[in-house]
Structure formats: structure tokens, C-alpha cells
Design a protein with these regions (language model features):
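Short amphipathic alpha-helical segments, especially helix-boundary/capping motifs
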Residues: 1-4, 15-18, 76-78, 92
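N-terminal helix-turn-helix DNA-binding core of bacterial DNA-binding proteins
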Residues: 4-51, 62
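Charged, amphipathic alpha-helical coiled-coil/dimerization segments
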Residues: 35, 39, 57-120
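Short, charged, intrinsically disordered terminal tails
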Residues: 124-128
Length: 128
């Protein structure tokens, strides 16, 4: 229930800036690695290549990314963030920071560390 509420609020925060969770994840990944191979990006984000292709089509249509054939490997496609993509990322980053502040209001550092530790253990348990 909490996960749904947090997810819905995060989606709303991004939507207010014209974004979405997939858009944020892609732009944020590209922001930290200015360009990357499309296949590597799909792996990094943990999504199937056809799903990423659909999202990239939309982002490219809006001028936020460009795709180019690799100069060294004709089979590989590089994805690059455009200037408009940088600006969109910055707008969404501002919304993400504000969302995180709102989410963590009234929760101390020790409580957040404890929450992180519990969530890490849950993830480890699921991976078994």
C-alpha cells in the first residue's frame, strides 16, 4: 500500500514537469553517461530492448535524445542526450529533489539508515 502511494505521488511529481518514470530513468542514466549503447542502456535500466525502443522513439520524437549508429560497430546504436534532454532532465531533477524532501520530512538520518538496511535485507531475501 505504501509503495503504491509513493509511486503514484512520484509519478504525479514527474508528470507536473511533463515527465514520467521511464523518461526520468532514461534521461538520468544518459545524464550520468552522456551517451551509451542502446543495449547497454536497456541492461542498466533492467528493461527489455523493445520496451526501451518504444520509450526512445517517444523521447526522440520530442527532441530529448538522438540515436546514432556506432562508428566502430554498425550493429550498435548509441543514444545521446540532446540539449533539450538536458533541460528536461534538470526540470525533472528539481521535481525529484523536492519530492524526496517531502517524502523524508520528519524522518531522521538514523531512521533512514535503518530503513535502507531493512530494504537491502529484503532485496537480498528476494534474490535467494
Amino acid at each position: 500500500m505504501t509503495a503504491k502511494a509513493v509511486s503514484a505521488a512520484f509519478n504525479a511529481a514527474l508528470a507536473a514537469e511533463g515527465g514520467s518514470v521511464p523518461t526520468w530513468l532514461i534521461l538520468n542514466a544518459l545524464r550520468h553517461d552522456r551517451w551509451t549503447a542502446q543495449l547497454d542502456l536497456a541492461r542498466e535500466l533492467g528493461i527489455e530492448s523493445p520496451t526501451l525502443t518504444r520509450h526512445l522513439d517517444n523521447l526522440e520524437e520530442h527532441g530529448l535524445v538522438v540515436r546514432r549508429q556506432s562508428e566502430t560497430d554498425r550493429r550498435a546504436v548509441r543514444v545521446e542526450l540532446t540539449e533539450a534532454g538536458e533541460e528536461a532532465h534538470q526540470q525533472m531533477l528539481t521535481a525529484v529533489i523536492a519530492f524526496n524532501r517531502r517524502l523524508q520530512a520528519g524522518i531522521g538520518r538514523d531512521e533512514l539508515r535503518q530503513l535502507d538496511a531493512v530494504l537491502d535485507r529484503l532485496a537480498e531475501n528476494v534474490a535467494r
